[in-house]
Amino acid sequence: MQFLWLCLLSAVTLQFTGTLAFYPIKLPDFTKGLVSNHGSIDRRFFTFPGLYKHAHTGSTTLNIRRGPSNYRRDNNYPAQIASPPTAPNTLGINNDGYDFSYFSEVKVGSEGQKMWMLIDTGASGTWVFGSDCTSKACGRHNTFGKEDSKTIKVTDEKWGVTYGTGKVSGVIVNDTMSFAGFELVTPFGSASTASDDFLNYPMDGILGIGPQDPNAKTPTVVQLLMQQKLLKSNVIGINLQRASEGATDGQITFGDIDKSKFSGELIYSNVVPDGYQWEIAMDDLIMDGKSLNLKGRTGIIDTGTSFLILPPADADLIHSMIPQANKGSGFYTLPCSTKVDIKLSIGGVEYTIQPDDYVGNETATKGTCNSLIVGRQILGPKQWLVGDVFLKNVYSVFDFDKNRVGLAARKYAGTKNPPSSTPSPGMFLLHAILCPKTISVLMLHIDPTSNKAPSGGSPGLPAESGSDSTTNGEATNGATSSPNSSSSVLTPTWLTLAVFFAIGSSLWS
């Protein structure tokens, strides 16, 4: 039985508290509105079998990073490692080998403790598992604390994230974080307790690179980089590697744009008015050349979300255009051979979403796969959560000074049919209301030593580096305001995606 777990989550500091609510909702009755009437912070969890089409990648060989016992305990996570970066201020972004999560290595403290951090444009706060944590989940991850650094300063400011079956909580600490050629003293959360849910989380923490609420009292990592004038330009450029292409050029560039990663020019869209996330206006969705007339939609551009998540009515319309697509038990299904041409139009440009990215794993019915375009009413009636299903097809730029997002068609070396972008006949712009900040984390249950499905244990992921950077021309459209490794053949046995929504208040307020 599949379930959709709707959980109200509160993020707390000394200045902010919240309440907890838990809403189990059986699937496939997923067309009912799930937007909570509660204030503060909302979290919703999607639980389902693995949605990745196994035939999509065939047998995927992944590097398994194994370090000394004092470096990583038993958390040897599989990953497709990005190539070491050659450009300054660039950090490699790795993936789990199945294109569900993207993460990088960050060194923390005076001794440079290595932590695998989820790269998240939907969050502004940063946190790690603390070494004083005795929870089982912390034992499966790298942790960081007083014994790992001579420069750490522990505050008495409480910090925590509470959700349905458990929580992560601790205090705010201050110490050095080193990444992409920067060494930055910054505040971040240190988790001293963590629920068993985190046994399945691949990351040791989250590196939040989303925009901050202007009322927040604590600066974010990106704000500190800008305040100290460490960036050539106050932009961040991201390209996510696609495992099925064998690509290893995933990277995030701080302060610059890598022209080699995209074709054509970057087209910019302004963030919607009063938006405290990377939310931009979208024009339409085009399928096999036919406009669906999905006007007035906005999308939160979120590297931390695996799927394309949109209101059920929009998902229904999209799947009505796919031959033999059916509303299955919680998710749409479609023929695994589906090749419908899907383009998302943003800023007057149509960006292709490859079938490999929206067609998921095969179901119990041979030849039938799950769709990774998911219908859920988790945001507003015209708001979409635009995650990695789309973002693997583009190079994305996040401009903090001009409060805008730039997109261009992504280049994949050696790809016969790379993602493309073509001008659309016109665009419709909408000023959207303030909507939730978004971060997401997924869980993979994988046996890191064989291709047999394990009966228990933890999933996988690590991280390393990737690529070069140059500047380019630009165009604008948008809303008018405002350390040894080995290899194994791995097959995912199940997947849980947790999509987090923070409403109205920052974790760091």
From Swiss-Prot:
Residues at the active site: D120, D302
Specify the domain of life of the species encoding this protein.
Answer: Eukaryota
Task: Tell me the keywords, alphabetical order.
Answer: Aspartyl protease, Cell membrane, Glycoprotein, GPI-anchor, Hydrolase, Lipoprotein, Membrane, Protease, Signal, Virulence
**Enzyme Commission number, as recorded:** 3.4.23.-
Top EC class, one word? hydrolase
Q: Where is the lipid attached (GPI-anchor amidated serine)?
A: S485
Annotated membrane topology is: Lipid-anchor; GPI-anchor
Q: Give a GO cellular-component term.
A: plasma membrane
Q: Which ranges of residues are annotated as propeptide in this record?
A: 486-509
- Pfam families reported in the protein's UniProt record: Asp (PF00026)
Q: Where is this region: Disordered?
A: 451-489
Protein localization: Cell membrane
Q: What's this chain's function? A: Probable GPI-anchored aspartic-type endopeptidase which contributes to virulence.
Q: Which family does it belong to?
A: Belongs to the peptidase A1 family.
Supply the name of the protein.
Answer: Probable aspartic-type endopeptidase CTSD
